[in-house]
Amino acid sequence: MKKLLIAFLIFLNFAALAEVMPYYINSLKRNGIGFTSVQSPLVMRRMPSDDGEILETLNFDYAANASCLINKQRCSLDEIFAAYSESKKIALLTTLDVSENWSMVCFNQIDRPICGWVDEKLGNKYYNWSDFFNIYGRKYGLYMFKDLQKADKVLYAGHMKQTNTTGSIELPKRITPWLVQGNWVLVKVNDFNNQLKTGWLNYRDDRGKLKVFVKFD
């Protein structure tokens, strides 16, 4: 019985590691211009060119396993990905810059993160904020980070805080984005009491930190 319990706990831990989502404002260690959906094996280069020096090659298999070939070490998923969903087969890295068909991406590490250019012709795809919320957000919905203040949950009539408020988000069943303007997203909210609300939500602060994310899990 004890062995079965230990095996069950290991299984739960293994399964949990296969889903990495940010739930707090500081869960994402890098502020970027969007996200890049990446494919394995992922080759990261110093320059946006096929001739650029290879900085790292990342392998992952959507089963809680990821390894770096250059450093020859197994990596923690939450130290690499901004979001990683085994069930949706989605792996996202923070994007810092773009150049034609290349994206500069960065691992989600605090100290000495690995950053490099990845080729979009190899199946990787960059999403700016508008595309990220309009494509993924409309499909899966959004969720708010757990450590938001009440002021962060207020809905406005326009995409600025100087406009009138239209309500606030309490316990949402679903948040659906419709339009992105700067750091604001127009959302339709189905709240806990089935009350429908519409308004502009400030999804990113002036420092570039996100307050909401796509509900992949």
Model segments located where?
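Boundary regions of SH3-family modules and the immediately adjacent low-complexity/disordered segments
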Residues: 19-146, 188-217
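Long, low-complexity, intrinsically disordered N-terminal extensions of eukaryotic proteins, enriched
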Residues: 13-16, 178
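Intrinsically disordered, low-complexity segments enriched in Gly and acidic/Ser/Thr residues
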Residues: 137-186, 190-196, 201
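Sec-dependent N-terminal signal peptides
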Residues: 4-14
